Amino acid sequence: MSQQFTLRSHNSSITFIYPSPTSSLHLYTADSTGLIIEWDLITRRPVITWQAHNDTILSMSTIHNHLLTHSRDNTIKIWNNTDCIMEIPCNSLNFSNVVVVHDEILITPASINSNNLDVYKITSDWQLTRLISDINVYQLVEKGIQFEEIGSRNDYGIIMKIHLVDNIIYVGFESGDIVGLELILPKPIVKENSNIDKLIINQSPKLIVKYHNSIHVPNPIISMSTFQDILVSGSTTNKIVIHKHPVEIIKVTHSGVQSIVNYKNENLIIGFWNGEIRYDENVIKRDVPMIQNNDNDDRSKSIKKLTFMTLLVPQKVESTTTGKNKYSQLIRGKKILTTDTLLVGYEDGSIVAYKV
């Protein structure tokens, strides 16, 4: 892998990188202060910068063609450009993300207990309904009960990660447990009598346990990804688990698997806490702080802790400019968008692009 370019405008740790769902030439990045920057990947400069939240942004997604963000300031927001059109209070006592399913279902840590789950439905006219409240996954697994609403102090610790694979919602916990849940959304039952009157019976949504794995126990889950339609997970140790049958365990070179990126369903790109990235035989190392035993420590060494990774895949180049500017834009865009690019965020606020 070779370095292509670096994006620099954040002054705080990068917490999320999200390719724009509406433009292949744009990119969203977020940091630990709640700042979001929309980038033009051709000019490699910010297009829009706004203070979306007052604390770390944990998630970025899309719902009904609008940007959705989730922060440790206990809010989930939906945006029309930089205007917030909907705000949902949430519990962000942990560092878990949120997940959007079927473009209208939102899975979040529960507002009552961040160790549990809430399920919401958001319609295209921005009506909010809580379908399932404070579901305790631990009880669901241990008791084998299918239920709609329950709360308890018995659990697997805080929720660390949520990830969707083939309509199964995987939840990774502080304990190291991973639970796969299927969301059942029954259709209303319509009954008719002889007078042509209709009775509509709404059935309650349910979460059903489809998978449970404890290989990572007692180490917290810190990364989840998809590989060949199968869940892949990493923890604070040097172990990556591919959740196929039978389960495959891969020992890696370092502890702290911060990020796992699926590359073309052929290989995994692994990013570690210490800033190192590994892909096949390729290794990228970044400087990290060193502990010294004397008073003349070199404090000038830059901290390059890796915080986030995502893959930018080639897309068709589009341009709205004309003349020489259009030609220049197409040439630069072609260089970016015909190459698989790994975008890596670091604690110092930089985003580095590597050619894969």
Curated annotation (Swiss-Prot):
The keyword Zinc does not apply. It is found in: Nucleus. SMART domains: WD40 (SM00320). Gene3D superfamilies: YVTN repeat-like/Quinoprotein amine dehydrogenase (2.130.10.10). WD repeats lie at residues 9-49, 52-89, 210-242, 243-283, 317-356. Its main location: nucleus. Keywords: Chromatin regulator, Nucleus, Repeat, WD repeat. Component of the ASTRA chromatin remodeling machinery complex. This is ASTRA-associated protein 1.
